[in-house]
Amino acid sequence: MPSCPVPANTDDIARFVMRIIQASLEHLDLITPLFVKYREFYGELPFPDSSRAFLEKRLRRKESVIYLAMPDNDDTKVLGFCQLYPSFSSLSLKRVWILNDIYVAEDARRMLVADHLMRTAKKMAKDTQAVRMRVSTSSGNEVAQKVYESIGFREDAEFKNYVLPIASD
């Protein structure tokens, strides 16, 4: 997929431009450190080797779509990423995309990185004729909730979601 130049916030436009690209296996070593930080943010142990293997499997099997935000002039730095998984709706008979992971590097926050990643994901969802995108976040993550709402996500008032943990005995 071609990259799309995206200006950061208006204060930084003169000195900083980012692009959003779809990740491939060649980006694996760039994504992994940020993916590890994402896992740590949610209280998980880093497991860099397992994290890399997980991402490699998703990319190799084409089981997810990962978008990367990168500085326009630097192919060695990732500002943020989002990972989407395909699903389907039996009721609407259409595709659904699950925005499962999104993370922005600490030094790239407040530059609209998450906003641009999600807008790219939304365009991909439209291009694949999806009926909707779904996202979940912790109840207390008000920053993420505001970002999601700013691009059009609405809290689901119709369905209550449940989780069934599967023990690994």
Predicted regions and their residues:
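Conserved N-terminal entry element of GNAT/NAT acetyltransferase domains
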Residues: 2-29, 168-169
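Conserved acetyl-CoA-binding loop-helix of GNAT-fold acetyltransferases
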Residues: 104, 110-123, 146, 150
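Conserved GNAT acetyl-CoA-binding A-motif
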Residues: 125-136
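Short coil/turn motifs at secondary-structure junctions
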Residues: 87-89, 107, 140-142, 167
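Acetyl-CoA-dependent GNAT
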Residues: 22-94, 100, 119-120, 124, ...
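Conserved active-site alpha-helix within GNAT-family acetyltransferase domains
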Residues: 115, 139-158, 164
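Residue-level recognition of the GNAT/N-acetyltransferase active site
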Residues: 100, 105, 138
